[in-house]
Amino acid sequence: MRNVLTTLIIGLTSVSAAFASGGDGPAIPSQDWSFSGAFGTYDKAAMQRGYKIYREVCASCHAMKRVYFRNLEALGYNEAQIKNIAAEYTVINKEPNDEGDMFERPALPSDAFISPFANDNAAKYANGGALPPDLSLIVKARGNGSNYITGLLTGYEEHPPHGQEVADGQYWNTYFPGHKLSMAPPLMDGQVSYEDGTPETLDQYAHDVVQFLTWASDPHMEIRKSTGFKVIVFLLMFAGVMLSVKRKIWSDVH
């Protein structure tokens, strides 16, 4: 029985390592994330920059159907800013007007992020038959998601290694399983302007947009950590009280 358990543990460890590294190829580099650890929190400035990158670059192909404009409050935007951001988009109202016709209106904070395509078929047609994944939960979709996506965004090589070839329309990526993918490098130095003086580099872009995507995948992380800490403190205090009660009871017995 012990040998079986040992084998199972080794197998699970190997599988976990494979997922964490993204499959074959070199290990995914670990980044220094503000949200790491028991007391980690999201960096709101980085999330706002990441949202800017999503709007200006990623949103042309990728939807985020599970995120609503009102959720941007967590990034530090106030109510007026959120209304202005939402109003930049138009949506088809879910209910017809008095004449029975569907109509377009400015988006509201209660609306979900606007998808770049009307439906999946339109998305596939515009992307050579491939459906761009929704990014709402992309970080949670695989182990080591934040580091993996950062590696994916920064792992493109202009030329494949010696002896390797890529077909027309494909690109070589160091950290993508199989290394060959159809998505062109989405980010490059100087592509998106930052107003706060943050370096406009590929590495910084990747760090910021992944900070935003990590929040989108796990928006309640900070609350969960805070609640967990309070529970631990309560349990420690409760244990101390119970220990005192026990000592008092047994002292009377003796």
Segments from the language model and where they lie:
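Membrane-proximal low-complexity regions enriched in glycine and acidic/polar residues
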Residues: I92-K180
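Extended, hydrophilic extramembrane loops/domains of integral membrane proteins
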Residues: F176-P177, L181-D218
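Bacterial N-terminal signal peptides
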Residues: T7-S16
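Juxtamembrane interface at the cytosolic side of transmembrane helices
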Residues: R224-T227, V233-H254
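The canonical Cys-X-X-Cys-His
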Residues: Y54-K65, V209
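Electrostatic cytochrome c docking/interface patches
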Residues: A27-K52, A63-I82, G197, S217-R224
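Boundary at the C-terminal end of the N-terminal hydrophobic targeting segment
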Residues: A17-G22
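Positively charged n-region of N-terminal signal peptides that target proteins for export
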Residues: M1-V4
